[in-house]
Amino acid sequence: MSARQPAIADTALVTAIDAVIEAGRRSAERGWVPATSGNFSVRVDAERIAVTRSGVDKGRLTPNDVLCQQLSQPLVAGSSAEAELHRRLYADDAEIGAVFHTHAVSATVLAQLHRGERLLTLSGWELQKALAGIRSHETVVEVPVVANDQDVVALANEVAARLAAPVAAGAVRAPGYLIAGHGLYAWGHTAVDAFRHLEALDVLFTQILTLRRHAS
């Protein structure tokens, strides 16, 4: 059942659906979600999220392409398997209000390059101050990298373990993680925050790849 079919008008749900559609459109404009890839979700309330269904063009989303998912329940029919990664993030952190996943080239390639280290470190970039809690370009920002896994429950458990682990002394964890050869998950307290993090991380990753090309 689509999220636009509640028996009673649900303003919070409608607002979340609209935010999901907007995030999908803006990401498609930037070329981050080719060939129906990626998925987007926004928290409705403590118990529910609005999340994109499987196999739809994220640049042309309609309300019927967005599902209402109870955090405590199995994935609803039509869900992407990756909706479990969204559900787990919300369930583990009540401060997360939106989660956006893209297949941008910069994120996918860097994640593959750092698969062995299982970590990408950012430092020295002014734009990293666009990430919540970062006040200086000198701050060391850690972005976890996990191996891709078609067992999404196992992948969600791996991500949860990585996010629960301590960062290095003096470092700060980014509001996102990378899946090797797959892409980026970024989140924020609101949909606006999550998209800012998504955009900032994409540019930061592009800057790193550009620097490496010139340094080689």
Swiss-Prot record:
SMART domains, alphabetized: Aldolase_II (SM01007)
The reply on keyword Lipoprotein is no
Catalysed conversion reaction: 5-(methylsulfanyl)-D-ribulose 1-phosphate = 5-methylsulfanyl-2,3-dioxopentyl phosphate + H2O
Give an example GO cellular component term for this record. Answer: cytosol
MF (Gene Ontology): aldehyde-lyase activity; methylthioribulose 1-phosphate dehydratase activity; zinc ion binding
GO BP term, example: L-methionine salvage from methylthioadenosine
Identify the Gene3D superfamilies for this entry.
Class II aldolase/adducin N-terminal domain (3.40.225.10)
Q: In which pathway does it act?
A: Amino-acid biosynthesis; L-methionine biosynthesis via salvage pathway; L-methionine from S-methyl-5-thio-alpha-D-ribose 1-phosphate: step 2/6
Going by the UniProt record, its keywords in alphabetical order are:
Amino-acid biosynthesis, Lyase, Metal-binding, Methionine biosynthesis, Zinc
Q: How is the cofactor bound?
A: Binds 1 zinc ion per subunit.
Q: What is its EC number?
A: 4.2.1.109
Q: Which Pfam families match?
A: Aldolase_II
Required cofactor(s): Zn(2+)
Q: What InterPro entries does the annotation carry?
A: Aldolase_class_II_sugar_metab, Aldolase_II/adducin_N, Aldolase_II/adducin_N_sf, MethylthioRu-1-P_deHdtase_MtnB
State where Zn(2+) binds.
101, 103
Q: What class of enzyme is it?
A: lyase
Report the sequence similarity comment from the record: Belongs to the aldolase class II family. MtnB subfamily.
Q: What task does this protein carry out?
A: Catalyzes the dehydration of methylthioribulose-1-phosphate (MTRu-1-P) into 2,3-diketo-5-methylthiopentyl-1-phosphate (DK-MTP-1-P).
Q: Which protein are we looking at?
A: Methylthioribulose-1-phosphate dehydratase
What is the name of the gene encoding this protein? mtnB
